[in-house]
């Protein structure tokens, strides 16, 4: 399978993304010589990885934007027949220790969400994975109000992490951004700050965008 060369510039990336609109996942997988999974229970990241590969994304699992040279993060978003997001959107792993001096401006969440290429994909479970079609891509940059909401949630969540209250944080915290356990395996552990300031072990957490927020982004474009 030939590796796709990363796009040289933003117009080239957008052209590639627009060329995928209306195409099924099975068609793209066939071009790349890949098998389509029967369902996504064990292959949750398969759709995102397929789109990343087809567009020539470079980051893989590294903590940086997918198209670092273009300043663009790629996010696939499963939608229903009404164009509404079906699930929250993973942004990045949340730091639970060594967070002194970390600010919103130098956080990975801020870096990743500076400019996002959203690629909607049909996600309703009754549609076989291979038959699901890719939608029209959206290049999004948060406006001042969206940035303020993101920053506010991030700062409140990070303050609770710094106070050792990570266990008290639930998915209900935050208007647009939430913190949730990240690992598929609940035995995975990482260091976090305890309430007395020492370090303790806990499950890794990730930052996720709530569906109400991503629905707002899609609505602005598609109405």
UniProtKB/Swiss-Prot annotation:
Record-linked InterPro entries: DNA_mismatch_repair_MutH, DNA_rep_MutH/RE_typeII_Sau3AI, DNA_rep_MutH/T2_RE_sf, Restrct_endonuc-II-like
Localization, UniProt: Cytoplasm
Disulfide bonds: none
Pfam families: MutH (PF02976)
HAMAP family xrefs: MutH
UniProt similarity note: Belongs to the MutH family.
Job description of the protein: Sequence-specific endonuclease that cleaves unmethylated GATC sequences. It is involved in DNA mismatch repair.
Name of this protein: DNA mismatch repair protein MutH
């Amino acid at each position: 399978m030939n590796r796709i060369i990363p796009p040289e510039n933003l117009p080239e990336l957008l052209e590639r993304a627009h060329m995928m609109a209306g195409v099924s996942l099975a068609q793209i997988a066939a071009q790349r010589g890949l098998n389509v999974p029967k369902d996504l229970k064990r292959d949750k990241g398969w759709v995102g990885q397929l789109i990343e590969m087809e567009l020539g994304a470079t980051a893989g699992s590294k903590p940086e934007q997918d198209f670092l040279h273009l300043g663009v993060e790629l996010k696939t978003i499963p939608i229903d027949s009404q164009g509404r997001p079906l699930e929250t959107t993973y942004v990045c792993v949340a730091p639970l220790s060594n967070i002194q001096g970390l600010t919103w401006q130098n956080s990975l969440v801020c870096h990743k969400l500076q400019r996002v290429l959203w690629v909607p994909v049909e996600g309703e479970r009754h549609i076989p994975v291979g038959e699901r079609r890719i939608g029209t891509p959206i290049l999004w940059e948060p406006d001042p109000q969206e940035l303020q909401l993101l920053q506010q949630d991030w700062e409140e969540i990070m303050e609770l992490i710094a106070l050792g209250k990570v266990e008290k944080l639930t998915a209900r915290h935050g208007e647009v951004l939430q913190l949730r356990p990240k690992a598929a395996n609940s035995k995975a552990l990482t260091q976090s700050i305890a309430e007395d300031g020492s370090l303790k072990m806990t499950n890794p957490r990730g930052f996720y965008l709530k569906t109400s927020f991503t629905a707002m982004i899609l609505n602005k474009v598609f109405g």
